[in-house]
Amino acid sequence: MPPPALVLLLGFLCHVAIAGRTCPKPDELPFSTVVPLKRTYEPGEQIVFSCQPGYVSRGGIRRFTCPLTGLWPINTLKCMPRVCPFAGILENGTVRYTTFEYPNTISFSCHTGFYLKGASSAKCTEEGKWSPDLPVCAPITCPPPPIPKFASLSVYKPLAGNNSFYGSKAVFKCLPHHAMFGNDTVTCTEHGNWTQLPECREVRCPFPSRPDNGFVNHPANPVLYYKDTATFGCHETYSLDGPEEVECSKFGNWSAQPSCKASCKLSIKRATVIYEGERVAIQNKFKNGMLHGQKVSFFCKHKEKKCSYTEDAQCIDGTIEIPKCFKEHSSLAFWKTDASDVKPC
């Protein structure tokens, strides 16, 4: 008969073999939950893996039973993120993204001339849908531009709906007698409005003054307005200093104030000078005198170097200063060499 202690040991081992070992807490599976979740499980107990919201199961099995060995079977189940519909193309815009999987967010922007109609970003939801809905890039348009007072449109080509696209231009012109202040061209901006409008103002000019020793002609109207013109002239032996025609400017004054300048009488009877790049006889070219503003170059002798150089003289309102270095020779002094005939320095 075996000892009592041995009998008890054999009975315990038989109980363990029949009862089996407990299973530990299962290994974590990314993006999943286990029901029920405990520290240990008795042989025969079942657990169920399920993927968290936003994830779907791929491969493997979801339900496991704790075996007598106390070792869970290898779990090949994978929980993969849901994939939202492709959204990588936005007409007339740009999409910035890494992937289209849950829970990623993508952002949107539009090209120049278009605005975002909808949200600037969207998130891939648990259901595999974009939230909020994907936006579109709509063209920026401007309504017809307001027309300033005393102005009209000279260039304007709207769309069929009488609107204009971003970047479109409109050009204004002022009514007669009115001057424009500001840019005559406005542009449809990215904000859906037009750049600053110009202003048209009525402009009047005083009657132009008659210059001394001259005359002025202008329209025989009681009032002279913007863009009206006047012409000036001078009496004999006087020349006009300034433009012959002047215009009433947008600032209410004349574009210029010409005057009449006296011509110069020459005391020199005989000399060769340079006028407008050519050698001329002053007694022939300017026998009636030099007009205001005309300029000549006189020849002078350099005594030490025995060569010639030139100095300028200009008629200024009836006065001309002859260079001191110039020496006029009498026609009888035929033996003297004129400075104009000496080699240049």
From Swiss-Prot:
Residues 21-81, 82-139, 140-202, 203-262 form the Sushi domain. Expressed by the liver and secreted in plasma. Pfam families: Sushi (PF00084), Sushi_2 (PF09014). Glycans are attached at residues 33, 92, 162, 183, 193, 253. GO terms for molecular function: heparin binding. Residues 1-19 form the signal peptide. This is Beta-2-glycoprotein 1. It comes from Bos taurus. The lineage of its organism: Eukaryota, Metazoa, Chordata, Craniata, Vertebrata.
